[in-house]
Amino acid sequence: MPLGPEERRLLRLIAFLYRSNPYPSVEGTARQRRRARRRWKNRQKQIYALAERIWGTRQEDQLVQAIDQLVLDTQHLVTQQLPDPPSQA
């Protein structure tokens, strides 16, 4: 399934979020490095949750649009001209 411009924009935004949180440097004492990794990991979890919300909202919107289209298609089928039933003569 090819991605449209909206999906590409969302993917660029998600990629930017991940790039904005680089892995911590190896400088400092063991305790400082451990704390930096812990903070980095917590930020990664937040970014992951945010990315899920961004991408999940898009999928929900598509699902709502698909359901609306099905409802319209069904209404169109119901209102089409149907042939008269055979008469019992």
UniProtKB/Swiss-Prot annotation:
Its predominant location is host cell
The UniProt entry's GO biological process terms, in alphabetical order, are:
mRNA transport
Q: Does the keyword Signal apply?
A: no
- Keywords of the record: Host cytoplasm, Host nucleus, mRNA transport, RNA-binding, Transport
- Cite the GO molecular-function annotations of the record: DNA-binding transcription factor activity; RNA binding
* Signal peptide positions on this chain: none
Per the Swiss-Prot or TrEMBL annotation, the motif Nuclear export signal is positioned at 70-82
Annotated Gene Ontology cellular components are: host cell cytoplasm; host cell nucleolus
Q: Where is this region: Homomultimerization?
A: 13-21
Q: Which residues form a coiled coil?
A: none
Q: Respond yes or no to whether keyword Signal is given for this record.
A: no
Which InterPro entries does this UniProt record tie to the protein?
REV_protein
Top-level lineage group: Viruses
Q: Where is the protein situated, by its record's location annotation?
A: Host nucleus, Host nucleolus; Host cytoplasm
Instruction: Give start-end ranges for motif Nuclear localization signal and RNA-binding (RRE).
Output: 29-45
Q: How does it assemble?
A: Homomultimer; when bound to the RRE. Multimeric assembly is essential for activity.
Q: What is known of its domains?
A: The RNA-binding motif binds to the RRE, a stem-and-loop structure present in incompletely spliced viral pre-mRNAs. This region also contains the NLS which mediates nuclear localization. These overlapping functions prevent Rev bound to RRE from undesirable return to the nucleus. When Rev binds the RRE, the NLS becomes masked while the NES remains accessible.
Q: What does this protein do?
A: Escorts unspliced or incompletely spliced viral pre-mRNAs (late transcripts) out of the nucleus of infected cells. These pre-mRNAs carry a recognition sequence called Rev responsive element (RRE) located in the env gene, that is not present in fully spliced viral mRNAs (early transcripts). This function is essential since most viral proteins are translated from unspliced or partially spliced pre-mRNAs which cannot exit the nucleus by the pathway used by fully processed cellular mRNAs.
This protein's name: Protein Rev
